[in-house]
Amino acid sequence: MMQKSLTIALIVVSICALGVISASAQPQLLDPDVFKVNYFSNNGVSGAPDATVRVTNPGTSNGNLCAMVYVFDNDQQMDECCGCITTPDGLRTFSVTKDLTSNPLVGIVVKTGDVKIVSAAVNNSPCEPSANVTPYPSLRAWGTHIQNKVGSAYPITETEFQAATLSAGELSSLQADCYFVERLGSGHGICSCGTGD
């Protein structure tokens, strides 16, 4: 009887251990309304217009929020990052050319890439994208896209940023990459907050 109880106890402990290992292997997911992604194209191409990114705080949080902005080239390397305050019901407008890609880490202007925005609580000075980012839902964003030239014109389209699920690992990676960009760039790699709000 004692041996049967010991065997059952070992089986229960093994199953619990497997459950803990399995649970820890799952990525920790954060609120689904905190992470927005979109792309830009034909940036800085001669004759092409400038694209814009617009971010609004709908006011549902009853306070200021940070738009933590991370700009990547088409080779998946972070080129610029910045944190920008957004007040309730405020609208912030970024020029892709002047605000998001004019100060690249390596000195080469990115023609095509993507923009990731984390909606976050105000942290430091007032918005620091490289550390202590606490995702907080609500920001909305739209971006214009400069399409490939048709005849003599570059067609422009606009889309809402897509909501994506932000994992704790992705948030940690964004902050670490931005920290690296800020420290290595000696002033390069820091985007600017555009106009408005």
Residue ranges of model-derived segments:
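Bacterial N-terminal signal peptides that target proteins for export
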Residues: M1-L10
